[in-house]
Design a protein with these regions (language model features):
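ATP-dependent carboxylate-amine ligase
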Residues: 2-185
């Protein structure tokens, strides 16, 4: 992220920054970038309020259009950060798609209640299936927009009631982008 900020401060063109970000070899799960037409998709492990703020700051610096976000909150963890993360998302994104993350043994509906209780915004919805949330986020993109997919990063599974279900945000996004490209051809 620091390299992106430096490029912005040096007045490097947004197009070159996006190309450079896509070519960076960052740790898995941290600012993994996918290019989709004129859009940028960023997959990041950001799962705290501070981490979300940092990812949004970068996204706004490199985005000519709108920023959208897909995120969820982990179960059996700090409940107080859930509403904070929802507020950050709603204040920094054109539209927010809330979904599940790793509910572990906690009831996912209770997690959604914690995420939305007292939330005074109308730019969000809950999509209960994470894959559907990601594909919906991609479908919302117009020219020069950015989609943030936050919370899971490099993780290869979702933990639900002790079961580890194979799932990877980057893989899901790539597969859907390829489906779209194939349907156009």
């Amino acid at each position: 992220m620091a390299s992106i900020v430096i490029m912005v401060l040096e007045n490097i063109s947004i197009d070159l920054i996006i190309k450079s970000v896509c070519d960076l070899n960052l740790p898995k799960g941290r600012t993994e970038t996918l290019k989709y037409n004129s859009n940028l998709i960023i997959v990041d492990y950001a799962h705290t309020p501070d981490a979300m703020i940092k990812v949004f700051e970068v996204a706004h610096e490199v985005t000519k259009g709108n920023v959208y976000v897909v995120f969820g909150c982990t179960g059996d963890r700090d409940k107080d950060k859930r509403i904070k993360m929802s507020r950050i998302a709603c204040e920094n994104a054109k539209y927010v798609i809330m979904t599940h993350d790793d509910p572990h043994f906690e009831n996912q509906e209770e997690i959604y209640l914690d995420m939305t209780k007292g939330l005074k915004y109308d730019n969000y919805e809950i999509v209960r299936d994470r894959k559907d949330a990601i594909t919906k986020g991609i479908d919302m993109l117009k020219e020069n927009d950015t989609l943030l997919i936050l919370g899971k990063g490099h993780e290869e599974f979702i933990s639900i009631k002790g079961d580890k279900i194979p799932f990877n945000d980057t893989k899901i996004a790539n597969e859907y982008i390829n489906e779209i490209k194939e349907s156009v051809n």
